[in-house]
Structures are given as structure tokens and as C-alpha cells.
């Protein structure tokens, strides 16, 4: 009575297929990535946490964001002021958590706007009622560590350090890995053989022992740790890129480019590299997870960042040393697990989105 719907279905399917084909590979991958709700939600949440951590000084600091004292505005985050500026007796830097200073900033028309968490990562709460480490309280929502420092502030700054360190180590590893892998895969022959033997020797070096030696010789710093881990963090990706270049250099479009007189550098950069980036992009979230774990592990062992620097590994070490202070281990472990889970979910979704065997459906 109503007729067949097969021609309409066929036409609709053909239109959807043509639309999918008309999309660029990047847009098709992004479309598949967004379809993975867990991966997309993880990306949004992770980026939100990272952006918030970049403004850690605004969210968690022991200095007010802005002060209005006797009709004048002061910005303690941008400039240090002495206690005398706010009615004190000394030229020492003002302690804005001191009840005397806080009372001065409340008198009359004076006012001050503090960050949501009025503690910095190194701020010691000398006015706490309980001995350190103290349990969560209205003054310190996540409690304090064994030195009296606010735990929430350390988690915020430690998360930022871990993410930025992981990102920097990942970028350095990708740059070195792509360059070395591309040279090996495209050149082949003796060049590839020499690189492979060098990587075998380099990879057999005891990385942990070298870290211990350098930590004993040089003053610990984030830059030193980043340099040492970068010496070994590129080899895994280099093998993937090498395999892609070995495969792609035999394809017809590379032979056609050579026949047209295109230079080897241009062929590698403009033709082979874009078609070899799938394993590189898929590798990024997992590489970043490994970098964050490496930093946390080394800090836990005392081989990481300088003492006093807020870090997740140092907090885990404090939790081990203070078993009764459950809030230290629990909160730090939760931050670390959530971070690694978000990166893992993003990596799985990215791998599926870049899988050429996946077919788009309307």
C-alpha cells in the first residue's frame, strides 16, 4: 500500500556514505572519538582539571587576591608588602593568615578577598588546634601533612607539576623518537643497522642506577630529572615510527614523488610522516601516563624533585611513614588513580578513533 522503502534506504545510506567519505581523515577520527562517550568525557574532565591547575595560585594561596586597606588597593599575588603596610610594627613580609593582620584587614571599610583555599603548598598552619599531621577539618578540608602544610594545596600544585612534567617528557620523547625512527625507516640499510645496534646498547644501560648516581652528584631539580628521563624515553616510539616508514617508503606515492625529483627531506616530511602519525598520536596518552608514574615513583624513592616541592610521590611517602594519617594516602592515591584512568580512557578512545578498520555509520 505504501510502497517499498528500499530505494529510499539505499539513497539515504549512499548519502551517508558520501558524507563520510567527504570528511577529512582527521574529522572522521574526531567524529569517532566523540562517539566514544567515556573517552570524550575523560578528555573534557582532564582538560578542565589541567586548566584549573594552571591557575593554582588563584585557587590556593596564602595571600589575598586583592586587598582594600584605607582606601587603597593592594595585590599581594603580584607584589610583596611588609607588615607595616597594614598597620603592623615590622618590615617583614606580611603573614596574611596571622590573626592580627586578618583583623586589620577587616576593620572599618577595609576588606580582602582570599583564594577559595587560603593556603599555599608550603604554608604551615601555625594556628592549627591539632598536632600534625591533622585530620580534615573546616580549616584544612583535606587535613595537613606531617609538617603542618595544607594537603589540598599540595595536591593541586602536585597535580600541576605531574601533568606539566609528563607533557614535557612526552613532547621531548615524541620529537626525538619521530626523528630517529624516520631516519632509520627511510634510509634503511647500514644507517638502520647502526641505529639499531646503538639503541640496543643504549637501552641496556641501567636507567635507575644512572638516576641514583646523578642524583648524588648533582643537586636535584625538575630540569635534571627531565633531562635524564628524556635520554631513554624516546626509544619505544622510535621503533613504531621506523616500522611505519619502512612500510610507507615502498608505496607508489613515494616512488612517484622520487620520480618527480622531490627531495628526500620533503618526501619524509610532507608525504610519509603524515601517513605515519597514527601510532604516534595513539602513543601519547599512554606515554604521558608512564611519565607521571615515573615522576611519582622517583619522588617516592627520594630521587625526584627537590625537597619541599609539592609532589604526589612525596605525599605517598609521607602516607607510608604516617599510617594513622589515612587522609594523606587516600587523597593522594585518589588523585593519581583518577589522572591515570582519564589518560587510559582517552588513549583507548583515541586508538579506536584512529583504527582504519573502524567504519563510520550514519
Regions found by a protein language model. Give the residues of each.
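Alpha-helical transmembrane segments of integral membrane proteins
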Residues: 144-362
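Gly/Trp-centered helix-boundary motif
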Residues: 1-174, 178, 182-183, 308, ...
Amino acid at each position: 500500500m505504501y510502497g517499498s522503502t528500499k530505494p529510499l534506504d539505499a539513497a539515504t545510506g549512499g548519502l551517508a556514505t558520501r558524507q563520510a567519505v567527504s570528511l577529512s581523515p582527521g574529522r572522521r577520527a574526531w567524529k569517532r572519538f566523540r562517539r566514544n562517550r567515556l573517552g570524550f568525557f575523560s578528555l573534557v574532565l582532564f582538560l578542565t582539571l589541567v586548566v584549573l591547575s594552571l591557575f593554582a595560585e588563584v585557587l590556593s594561596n596564602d595571600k589575598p587576591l586583592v586587598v582594600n586597606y584605607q582606601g587603597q588597593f593592594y595585590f599581594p599575588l603580584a607584589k610583596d608588602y611588609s607588615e607595616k603596610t597594614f598597620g603592623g610594627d615590622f618590615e617583614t613580609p606580611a603573614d596574611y593568615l596571622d590573626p592580627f593582620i586578618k583583623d586589620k584587614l577587616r576593620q572599618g571599610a577595609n576588606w580582602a578577598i582570599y583564594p577559595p583555599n587560603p593556603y599555599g603548598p608550603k604554608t604551615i598552619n601555625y594556628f592549627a588546634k591539632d598536632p600534625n599531621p591533622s585530620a580534615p577539618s573546616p580549616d584544612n578540608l583535606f587535613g595537613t601533612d606531617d609538617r603542618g602544610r595544607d594537603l589540598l594545596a599540595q595536591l593541586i600544585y602536585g597535580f600541576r607539576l605531574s601533568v606539566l612534567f609528563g607533557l614535557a617528557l612526552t613532547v621531548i620523547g615524541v620529537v626525538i623518537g619521530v626523528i630517529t625512527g624516520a631516519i632509520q625507516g627511510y634510509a634503511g640499510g647500514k644507517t638502520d643497522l647502526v641505529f639499531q645496534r646503538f639503541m640496543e646498547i643504549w637501552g641496556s644501560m641501567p636507567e635507575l642506577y644512572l638516576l641514583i648516581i646523578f642524583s648524588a652528584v648533582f643537586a636535584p631539580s625538575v630540569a635534571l630529572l627531565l633531562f635524564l628521563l628524556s635520554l631513554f624515553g624516546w626509544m619505544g616510539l622510535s621503533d613504531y615510527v621506523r616500522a611505519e616508514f619502512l612500510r610507507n617508503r615502498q608505496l607508489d606515492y613515494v616512488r612517484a614523488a622520487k620520480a618527480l625529483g622531490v627531495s628526500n627531506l620533503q618526501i619524509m616530511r610532507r608525504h610519509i610522516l603524515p601517513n605515519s602519525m597514527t601510532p604516534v598520536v595513539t602513543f601519547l596518552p599512554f606515554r604521558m601516563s608512564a611519565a607521571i608514574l615515573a615522576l611519582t615513583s622517583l619522588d617516592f624513592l627520594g630521587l625526584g624533585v627537590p625537597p619541599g616541592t609539592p609532589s604526589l610521590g612525596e605525599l605517598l611517602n609521607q602516607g607510608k611513614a604516617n599510617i594513622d594519617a589515612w587522609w594523606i594516602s587516600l587523597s593522594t592515591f585518589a588523585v593519581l588513580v583518577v589522572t591515570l584512568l582519564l589518560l587510559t580512557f582517552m588513549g583507548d578512545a583515541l586508538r579506536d578513533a584512529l583504527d582504519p578498520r573502524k567504519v563510520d555509520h550514519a
